[in-house]
Structures are given as structure tokens and as C-alpha cells.
Amino acid sequence: VAFAVTAAALSLAPAGSASAHDFLIGSSPAANSVQATPLSEVTLTFNDIVLNIGGSSSIVQVTDASGAHFETGCATTLDRTVSVPTALGRPGTYTVTYQVVSADGHTVSSTFTFDYQPPPGTTAAAGFAASRCGHAG
């Protein structure tokens, strides 16, 4: 009887976020923003918990117009937040490309850009030909 009541209650409940993919609700720097100071990390915040499968299921890459990579380590995941350490190069437009595993187990990926306009005299990192974590892209 208890099972039947529980099953009936669940069948009346609206489909919630458990069946929907996670989505980005914020980032630092923000999409389409101008970053005027040196940046030590890029942080992405999602609407639900991002799964951390084996410690390598979240990928975040930060590249410039030439395709050079400016992430200095691998992405880390904590609840709804994914971060990657960075050291940016010359002023210009940077692209953040991410792939995470949503709370429902599906992969979610997208990109956004921001402009980097540091003060004159700021040291520019050289960047890398490939991701520091061995991910293609």
C-alpha cells in the first residue's frame, strides 16, 4: 500500500530538473564582458550539481584568436562550480570552451567569449600549443 501511494504521488509530481540538462547560470569573467585585470582562473557556475566522474569529466579550455591555450592546469569541480587556472596573454578576445557532465548524466558543452584589456605593462603569458590536461581542442 505504501508503495502504491508513493508511486501515485510521484506520478502526479511535475517533471523537475532531474530530467533537464544543467545549464550555465554565471561565469567569471562573464560572457561578452571586458576583463581589465589579470585573471588567475575562469569559473563557471551551473544551475545544478556537475558530476565529477573520475576527476576528469569537466573540461574547460581558454584560447585566444590564434588557438593558443591559456589554461595552466586542469579543471576542478565542486558542486555547481567548475574552475580552471589561467594566465592570459596579450590583449584581445578569448574563447572559453567547456564540457561537463550534467546532474542527469548527459554531457553539456558550449562556448563564450570575453575581451581581455589589461593595464599597460601587464606581463603576457606565452600560452601553450595544446591543453595542459591532454584534451584535444
Describe these PLM feature segments.
Residues S17-I25, T107-G137:
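Extracytoplasmic/periplasmic copper-protein system
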